[in-house]
């Protein structure tokens, strides 16, 4: 399910990935969209096609699979640019990335506790692949998008590539990092 909000001239969309309760955020303006921490969503893809979106910028708060699992999906449907902190990008392009042990462990433990089958369902839809990131940064990156300033700041802790994404000095996306 997509939740819509409006931030001035930008359509702001939030979606929770049903398998792992991970948030994806989308900023939509004209024929461009910014997706933060993507997961596969046919509903979002249909909306982006309906809005004639041609280009998608993918920003990652960090490199863990619950925040990157939809990259391939949007690459298949749109012209994409992936932006990630350098350490996260290096990990996503390594063979180690092909072993999502922590995520599968957590889902398995939740299944035991809750009597659910989320891990089994997740494995049916999860596509495991390495990614080459288009734009990396060491400590900070600023970019202008649709009259808005996007700032990415490296804050290692949760992962080596963890970053804050700040929009117009007003909105902060932390991924799994705590402030």
Where do the protein language model's features map onto the residues?
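Catalytic core of the metallo-beta-lactamase
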Residues: 1-55, 76, 123-179
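Active-site HxH/HxHxD metal-binding segment of metal-dependent hydrolases
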Residues: 40-41, 45-144
